[in-house]
Amino acid sequence: MHLILFIIFLISLPFAAEGEILRLNRDEFIETALKNEPRFQETRMAVLAKEGRVEQIKAGALLPKFELSMLTGVVPGLRKETDYYGQEVKAWDFTKMGPYFGMNIQAAQPLNFGQLQLGLRAARADLQQKKMEIEGKEQFLKVHLLSYYYGYLLAKEMNKLAQDGHKQMRKAADNLEEALDDGDEDASQMDLLELKAGFFEIDKAVLEAKSGLKKAQLAAKFALSLPDEVSFQPADSVLAAVADFVPDLDSLKNWAYMHHPDIRRLTAGLEATSMQMELASARMAPEFFIMGEFEYAKSWAGDRTSLSKNAFAQDPVNKLSGAFGVGIKYRLNFWNQWENYKLARIEHRILRQTESYANRGIELQIEEKYEDFLVAKSKLESARNALRATEGMLKGAAMQYDLNPSKTSGLLASAYKKNLLMKKDYYFAVYEYNMAVARLFAQAGY
């Protein structure tokens, strides 16, 4: 029984030591990494603060001042006395303390609804400006994260190529050694030495591929904020060219004019500064408001005559009063509002100046990235055609090797080496093409 438990324990050790693997496709990787980006967490909190500012302005449009105050305690009573002139007066009676209750209600409603609307529109434009700022940063952060994802797939392909190359070179060397041992006259010792000399490059490639794969794994874990016991694996098994449709240059420009985050942020900023100018100008005018107040106080102290029994009787303690009217407030320090107006006007002019060249600058950047995309696309097509050619050469060399292994081993090794190097160049071309598409889309805000 103890032996069986020991065997089960030994079998379960590899499974217990194996960490958890997180498999994500490209879009899931980007989404998860963006959620775990600490800098964007802070920026999103700033967006929430601006959303709260909008709600605060909306809530303050109706009865911004609506206060209720209440007080309860103990006060002295009142008694009637005759003064020096023989008149009856009321005096405090501290021998008869009693409970006291008082309340005061104040309410005010501004009538300058135009200013409230301007403030609300300015706050909404400021919120939109912040959202577009985040969206623009996310576009370029996605490019950085895509380099992690595609770089991981590229490292996997390089590792597979290096391992396969090492395996095939070892197999060719073993076959050549067998031919030499069998006394095959067509087998050459120089060919064997040449093969063995090439092992240094293969071993170097294997080590570099393993190191690159490890670095790519660490970069992906850092982007995803994964703990040490969790590793990342891309859902894609091979590095392939993205199938995303790439519009023509004019379509990308037209899209950018309408949807580019920087342009939309600039538009929102212009609207915000325009509203701030109007708001500063409006605040130099008087503000009208409606105000009301109600006050009630009652004491149950002193004598129990009709005055104290009447809930609305008024005396030095008991009160019942109210007021309602229309008021006006005028800011006499108009120079302060004038400075606010000038500041908003300067900021608005700066954004207007930026607008004059922003569209052209974005257009030129899109043209530059589109040219990079066309170059990467041409290189990928060229690499794909060259890869097909080396695969044909490899098949031909393999057929000749099957007919006469001893005489064609060098030809097979040369063809395999060319095919291996071409595969490496092809996968790098795929990586550059995918990144060129990502940079183009980010630049156009697509």
Can you say where each PLM-predicted feature lies in the sequence?
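Terminal intrinsically disordered/low-complexity segments used for targeting and assembly
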Residues: 1-32, 69, 82-87, 207-255, ...
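Bacterial Sec-pathway N-terminal export signals of envelope proteins
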Residues: 16-77, 124, 187-189, 228, ...
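Small/polar, glycine/serine/threonine/aspartate-rich low-complexity segments that form flexible
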Residues: 21-22, 67-108, 237-245, 278, ...
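A glycine-/polar-enriched beta->alpha junction
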Residues: 31-41, 48-65, 93, 97, ...
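Amphipathic alpha-helical coiled-coil segments
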Residues: 42-57, 137, 141-162, 198, ...
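Structural signature of outer-membrane beta-barrel domains
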Residues: 71-77, 114, 171, 295-299, ...
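Periplasmic alpha-helical coiled-coil/stalk elements that build and connect Gram-negative outer-membrane
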Residues: 132-134, 138-255, 372, 376, ...
